[in-house]
């Protein structure tokens, strides 16, 4: 019996309060309006960005259904939808691609003006929610809210992918892999024979290492205080791994000594102000490029000496690794299917969706790289 055009009741993980566990609730998911798509979720990854909301370092309206790194199957579409149809395998896009705004028309950027990151409203693009729980509207997250068995997204925030793709793996292309890999190949534009430093060895940091290796870097130095992650980093391309706690001097000084004055490219993939500055300082003063990849704490500022840039350094950042989402995500899935890269090493745990809080515990303990929740 078709559910198209009807309200669907399903399970979702609702965050009612900051710093509290998720509550598995029955929610009502309204049908898609014009130019919207309702998706049955199959697999979703637990990303550090979701945890930033739980901890309060990233601000979004509450109560909310989080989740933004996922893959599923189209259940129904609203009027006027042309790019996907019921039954299609898809990846929801935390950064949409409307194709019409100034940013979408700029070949150098992917930060579509329809995004819900800069000034989060917690709604779809028409300003309303499709979720109801306990007779209350529930906010969306980044316009996609994938910690729910069903979700509704705008058409410009979903990409059709290869029908043969394994959703429990390619869901990582929705955020973590693309963000890290793209930061190296698109944003920094790592060059063959170069030296790189990657701060933070979670799923995104390891993906950045994969990107540095793919771009031909000769030396990739992985930096983390959790030595348990070093073996995986080396498996994926790191040539050396160092722990800042093993040194009495600042880690940027250690890296500069190791690399004859500084690395060519550095990546901060943690989201801490102190490591962002260390990442900048460790790249060569005359020609180094440092990329901010980790989501910084909300409403906190960095103070720095402009001379650090005047000498020739470049300091930049990007969302989703600089990939234009709707056109690039299907290409990345195609590359995965062609075995141009593997995602297996990033996935350490697979849990049923109902064990979402256990998945976040694994993240907090440093025991997981990526936990995939299966619906």
Swiss-Prot record:
Cofactor note (record): Binds 2 Zn(2+) ions per subunit.
Residues reported in the UniProt entry to bind NAD(+): 48-52, 200-205, 224, 229, 270, 293-295, 318-320, 370
Keywords: Acetylation, Cytoplasm, Metal-binding, NAD, Oxidoreductase, Phosphoprotein, Zinc
Cofactor(s) of this protein: Zn(2+)
Domain of life: Eukaryota
Binding site residues for Zn(2+) 2: 98, 101, 104, 112
GO biological process: alcohol metabolic process; retinoic acid metabolic process; retinol metabolic process
Annotated positions binding Zn(2+) 1: 47, 68, 175
Alphabetical list of SUPFAM superfamilies matching this protein: GroES-like, NAD(P)-binding Rossmann-fold domains
Subcellular localization: Cytoplasm
Keyword Acetylation included in the entry's annotation: yes
N-acetylserine: modified positions: 2
GO molecular function annotation: alcohol dehydrogenase (NAD+) activity; all-trans-retinol dehydrogenase (NAD+) activity; butanol dehydrogenase (NAD+) activity; zinc ion binding
Role summary: Alcohol dehydrogenase. Oxidizes primary as well as secondary alcohols. Ethanol is a very poor substrate.
Subunit structure comment from the entry: Dimer of identical or heterodimer of closely related subunits alpha, beta, or gamma that are encoded by genes ADH1A, ADH1B, and ADH1C, respectively.
Family in the record: Belongs to the zinc-containing alcohol dehydrogenase family.
Protein name: Alcohol dehydrogenase 1A
Species of the source: Homo sapiens (Human)
Gene name linked to the record: ADH1A
């Amino acid at each position: 019996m078709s559910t198209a055009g009807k309200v669907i009741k399903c399970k979702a993980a609702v965050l009612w309060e900051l710093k509290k566990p998720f509550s598995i609730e029955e929610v009502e998911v309204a049908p898609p309006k014009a130019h919207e798509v309702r998706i049955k979720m199959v697999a979703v990854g637990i990303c550090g960005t979701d945890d930033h909301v739980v901890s309060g370092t990233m601000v979004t309206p509450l109560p909310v259904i989080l989740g933004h790194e996922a893959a599923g199957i189209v259940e129904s579409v609203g009027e006027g939808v042309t790019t996907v149809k019921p039954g299609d395998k898809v990846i929801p896009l935390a950064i949409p691609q409307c194709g019409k705004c100034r940013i979408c028309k700029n070949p150098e950027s992917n930060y579509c003006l329809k995004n819900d990151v800069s000034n989060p409203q917690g709604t779809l693009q028409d300003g309303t929610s499709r979720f109801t729980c306990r007779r209350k509207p529930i906010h969306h997250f980044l316009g996609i809210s994938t910690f729910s068995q069903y979700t509704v997204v705008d058409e410009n925030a979903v990409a059709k992918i290869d029908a043969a793709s394994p959703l429990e793996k390619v869901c990582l292309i929705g955020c973590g892999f693309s963000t890290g890999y793209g930061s190296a190949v698109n944003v920094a534009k790592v060059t063959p024979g170069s030296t790189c430093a990657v701060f933070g060895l979670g799923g995104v940091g390891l993906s950045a290492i994969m990107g540095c290796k793919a771009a031909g870097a000769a030396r990739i130095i992985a930096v983390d205080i959790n030595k348990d992650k070093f073996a995986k980093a080396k498996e994926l391309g790191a040539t050396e791994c160092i722990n800042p706690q093993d040194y009495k001097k600042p880690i940027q000084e250690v890296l500069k000594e190791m690399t004859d004055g500084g690395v060519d490219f550095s990546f901060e993939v943690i989201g801490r102000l102190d490591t962002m500055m260390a990442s900048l300082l460790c790249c060569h003063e005359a020609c180094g490029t440092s990329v901010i990849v980790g989501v910084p704490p909300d409403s906190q500022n960095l103070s720095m000496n402009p001379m650090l840039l005047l000498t020739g350094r470049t300091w930049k950042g990007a969302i989703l690794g600089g990939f234009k989402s709707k056109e690039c995500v299907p290409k990345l899935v195609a590359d995965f299917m062609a075995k141009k890269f593997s995602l297996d090493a990033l996935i350490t745990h697979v849990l049923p969706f109902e064990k979402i809080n256990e998945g976040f515990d694994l993240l907090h303990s440093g025991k997981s790289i990526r936990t995939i929740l299966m619906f």
